[in-house]
């Protein structure tokens, strides 16, 4: 049998794939070793433990999320950029549903790179909000509200809420929610 050229990135990619099949909480060194057809101790050449794998996966996901958000927002008006952020964030969360929780482990790790990437994500929203001539405090609050609302909707969806209820789909509710949040920016008196 040929020796596999194992890398940290391959382990991260396998973690994402396995999480989609067996659930993130079931991904372990033995499961990863089985995936690669190797013995589990070989993984210790790349990571000390599963917590390091989870953090590396979180960094990978946050980088990809920031890339997708930035490219979705570039060249748009501030309002359109925020809408693109919301839609791109939701698509990302749906694509990576099995590992979505990892982009929210920033304060549980002590990882400077992950913290920096999370702040970059926040800056994308705050920079767009600067165009609405808000006070620093309003920018801060609206940024938190916007990101919290998106995360809440995604989390509740992943928990099984928002299933088809009559003739209203979760996509319609998401669009309504984003429209309502952004409409307040169009009329500063509502803020």
Question: Where do the language-model regions lie?
Answer:
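N-terminal intrinsically disordered/low-complexity leader segments
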Residues: 1-6, 189-191
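An amphipathic alpha-helix adjacent to DNA-recognition modules
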Residues: 5-16, 20, 25-26, 37, ...
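Residues within helix-turn-helix
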Residues: 30, 41
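The alpha-helix within a helix-turn-helix
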Residues: 33
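Hydrophobic/aromatic residues within well-ordered alpha-helical segments
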Residues: 57, 61, 65, 85, ...
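Amphipathic alpha-helical packing segments from all-alpha helical-bundle domains
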Residues: 70, 108-136, 140-145, 156, ...
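Hydrophobic alpha-helical connector segments
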Residues: 70-98, 110, 134-136, 142-146
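Amphipathic C-terminal alpha-helical segment
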Residues: 95, 102, 148-167, 180-191
């Amino acid at each position: 049998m040929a020796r596999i050229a194992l890398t940290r990135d391959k382990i991260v990619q396998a973690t994402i794939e396995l999480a989609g099949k067996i659930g993130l909480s079931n991904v372990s060194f033995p499961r990863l070793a089985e995936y690669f057809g190797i013995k589990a101790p070989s993984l210790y050449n790349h990571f000390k433990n599963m917590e390091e794998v989870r953090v590396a996966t979180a960094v990978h996901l946050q980088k990809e999320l920031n890339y997708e958000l930035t490219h979705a927002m570039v060249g748009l008006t501030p309002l359109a950029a925020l809408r693109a952020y919301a839609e791109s964030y939701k698509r990302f969360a749906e694509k990576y549903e099995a590992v979505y929780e990892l982009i929210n482990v920033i304060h549980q790790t002590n990882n400077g790179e992950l913290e920096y990437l999370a702040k970059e994500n926040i800056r994308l929203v705050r920079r767009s909000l600067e165009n609405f001539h808000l006070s620093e405090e309003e920018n801060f609050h609206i940024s938190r509200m916007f990101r919290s609302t998106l995360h809440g909707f995604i989390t509740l969806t992943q928990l099984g809420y928002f299933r088809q209820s009559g003739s209203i789909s979760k996509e319609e509710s998401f669009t309504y929610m984003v429209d309502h949040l952004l409409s307040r920016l169009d009329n500063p008196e509502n803020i």
